[in-house]
Amino acid sequence: MQLALAAKYIGAGISTIGLIGAGIGIGIVFAALINGVSRNPSLKDTLFSYSILGMALSEATGLFCLMISFMLLFAV
């Protein structure tokens, strides 16, 4: 019983590694936004809307990883 509980906690911890990728992805998206606005300030509104879309897609991946982690902890 203790081995199954330990495996559940280890699996939940490993499944949160995807959150690191989401954080890096969001950082890259907004770094590209800053770079694009500094090169062409007239496209600020367009670039901002694209960066929000990119941030949402990157954050969705992280939320899926977090959901799997919670499912491993509380549903299995």
Curated annotation (Swiss-Prot):
This protein is called ATP synthase subunit 9, mitochondrial
| Gene it is expressed from | ATP9
Question: Residues at site: Reversibly protonated during proton transport?
Answer: E59
SUPFAM superfamilies recorded for this chain? F1F0 ATP synthase subunit C (SSF81333)
Q: Where in the cell is it found?
A: Mitochondrion membrane
CDD domains in UniProt: ATP-synt_Fo_c_ATP5G3
What Pfam families has UniProt attached to this entry?
ATP-synt_C
- What are the protein's UniProt keywords? CF(0), Hydrogen ion transport, Ion transport, Lipid-binding, Membrane, Mitochondrion, Transmembrane, Transmembrane helix, Transport
Tell me the organism's taxonomic lineage.
Eukaryota, Fungi, Dikarya, Ascomycota, Saccharomycotina
Q: What does this protein do?
A: Mitochondrial membrane ATP synthase (F(1)F(0) ATP synthase or Complex V) produces ATP from ADP in the presence of a proton gradient across the membrane which is generated by electron transport complexes of the respiratory chain. F-type ATPases consist of two structural domains, F(1) - containing the extramembraneous catalytic core and F(0) - containing the membrane proton channel, linked together by a central stalk and a peripheral stalk. During catalysis, ATP synthesis in the catalytic domain of F(1) is coupled via a rotary mechanism of the central stalk subunits to proton translocation.
The record's HAMAP family line, in alphabetical order, gives: ATP_synth_c_bact (MF_01396)
Q: How does it sit in the membrane?
A: Multi-pass membrane protein
Q: Which PROSITE patterns match?
A: ATPASE_C
GO process terms (BP): proton motive force-driven ATP synthesis
